[in-house]
Amino acid sequence: MRGKKPLSENEVKSLRKLLEDKPLHSLLLNIGVDTMLRGSDLLNLKVSDVVTESGKVKTEVRVKMMKTKKNTLLIPLSPNSIKVIKKHIVGNNPDDFVFRSSFSPFTKKPLSIFQYSRIVKKWMTMLGKENVSEYSTHSIRKTKSSVIYQKTQNVEIVSKVTLSF
């Protein structure tokens, strides 16, 4: 297999359980899998991208892709993502990053790609993976389309889901 491996549906379920009490990790996993965004786009999400001014969790995220400069995309969020956003993000400052780095609490910078990559590798260790180098932030991006393909064996459906990416 070329590139980084995606996670299986069972691996995602296991991680959701393992990460329940880790807000940042739970948010990264759920929103990362749902949105299929590149790490750079995912980490730049702000609270206002996922929560309305009145404090309600949005059911869709509006994102302009940084790398490709593509038009703004409207990406639906799953009940899992909505649940973790309600639990950990509602009430935060709308200008804060969803994935704020703990290394720079005063500058309020987002998590770096390097930090995100280390977190993904830590997850793989938690799952008992021996070769964590087969996984990266791109693994999270590829997971949803891989799960859809495994369930349907239909490339057209996967293409429709990932067409805008």
Residue ranges and their predicted role:
Residues M1-F165:
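Conserved catalytic core of the tyrosine transesterase superfamily
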